[in-house]
Amino acid sequence: METKYLDLLAQKYDCEEKVVTEIINLKAILNLPKGTEHFVSDLHGEYQAFQHVLRNGSGRVKEKIRDIFSGVIYDREIDELAALVYYPEDKLKLIKHDFDTKEALNEWYKETIHRMIKLVSYCSSKYTRSKLRKALPAQFAYISEELLYKTEQAANKEQYYSEIIEQIIALGQADKLITGLAYSTQRLVVDHLHVVGDIYDRGPQPDKIMEELINYHSVDIQWGNHDVLWIGAYSGSKVCLANIIRICARYDNLDIIEDVYGINLRPLLNLAEKYYDDNPSFRPKADENRPEDEIKQITKIHQAIAMIQFKLESPIIKRRPNFNMEERLLLEKIDYDRNEITLNGKTYQLENTCFATVNPKQPDELLEEEAEVMDKLLFSVQNSEKLGRHMNFMMKKGSLYLKYNGNLLIHGCIPVDENGSMETMMIEDKAYAGRELLDVFERFLREAFAHPEETDDLATDMTWYLWTGEYSSLFGKRAMTTFERYFIKEKETHKEKKNPYYYLREDEAACRNILMEFGLNPDHGHIINGHTPVKEIEGEDPIKANGKMIVIDGGFSKAYQSTTGIAGYTLLYNSYGMQLVAHKHFNSKAEVLSTGTDVLTVKRLVDKELERKKVKETNVGEELMKEVAILEKLREYRYMK
């Protein structure tokens, strides 16, 4: 088998010189400094804030500009140049508007092209020429390379270089070149992006985030709880589908469902209009400018889908005793005559109920109309071209956890008990814990995705368990109290008890134990965690357990910013070490364009490398070394006999 593979490879490397050249090239790359990794998390559909962080590389762009031009140009010009790199098309329009004469604009073009070339050259200093070529604007690759590789000893060619720039301006191509070089800079300052979960949730534009990621040069995703809900819905889970519609109704984001993904909500609206009225518990968290009739419409949809969700949960709980969720059979605990429910031995009055479609004798039974609505919605979801594209990308680039360059990336938690031991769950008569449990969760999720026609098998039910189950690494609480929040006034019933992981992650020994569970070196590795907003306002530190745990909820969701005191955190990891970046609230692109101010506040060093880290010490390096080994075998097999 191996010789057949080597024969195939020999078609590409058909002489010894080609093999040797590639070996030299790969071995040289192994000794370059490692590229910069950029970690973001909890985007929650907030596209504008996310794409700003992406464009500025969590401050890397301005840092590079300062490295070159500090003391050479004014701070105001540094801000202007940074804004030009972030939003080249918009900034160019504003700048051109300020010039009275063509001559003055042309002088500005010359100066700016020189600066942009210097910036690209500096940002690409640790990359090979071939990697730089891929990052350059395709239509100007040759011209850009000529300008980039101009040396100090180029006196003989000075006029040649000047003429290139003169002609670019004369032929009306300056805007295109500057724009292309701006995007090259963005691409060069970050080698690889990690999205540590929750692209979806309450924000209005998760689809735009997905499009941005699909077009990004190098990315991976660690699924969040909200991402899995969307994957589950596309995979055939009706209860996951009910949840995403309920959340969109609650946060007045039904446009995502209907306008963005083309899912017809008319049958659901008809059902809602028939059975439900206005209800304060189900009014959306809507824009104040929304007309009252629209708010009432959403309120009715919200009730209709919430009641369908509660009904759909019951059969899963009953057919999956190993989920250990019998306590959540809430519709069966209600005294419908008295409008009361008994939880943990205490009876509570229910408020703002909407049980018009509930049969007290068989409360989890869907009306025929409800079942029809869910069938139509699921058909619509599974036949949405755009959603299919987004979910396929999510599966291709995503995983529940990732081991990358010695670090463990995970959105939620590793389920542990009070002593820090891995919690065990029985699945198909076998006990799973720690890494094995997460692996089995991911296997079921992929199985459900591969068989969207199955709607009530174990794999599909497991996608819902990942959203709400006690031992789910994505949920990390004992129970989800959605029902109680809608219908019970007493706040004690709303509390969701967190897994001990969330206080044990402050403890270095517990974090080292988790790193070892995943086969990572606890002396050098870190756990990089999303999911929970860091309450800096109350003095919480995102760097925990003596630097072993780094919590980087990006805080993109505006709803949490009042409790955190900041917008959130991102992380940078380059060849020199790790830096945590705190962000202020992002107001608007217009503000950045007009003032050049940034949303960054402070950077903190998490870890400093004693020696500059090289490519050979990374995941990419491991793959390159495997390629070198294969090429050396090919050389021996074909060319050294």
From Swiss-Prot:
High-level lineage: Bacteria, Bacillati, Bacillota, Bacilli, Bacillales
Family recorded in the similarity comment: Belongs to the FBPase class 3 family.
Keywords: Carbohydrate metabolism, Hydrolase, Manganese
Catalytic activity: beta-D-fructose 1,6-bisphosphate + H2O = beta-D-fructose 6-phosphate + phosphate
Superkingdom, natural source: Bacteria
Coiled coil (UniProt feature): none
Protein name: Fructose-1,6-bisphosphatase class 3
UniProt GO BP: gluconeogenesis
Pathway annotation from the record: Carbohydrate biosynthesis; gluconeogenesis
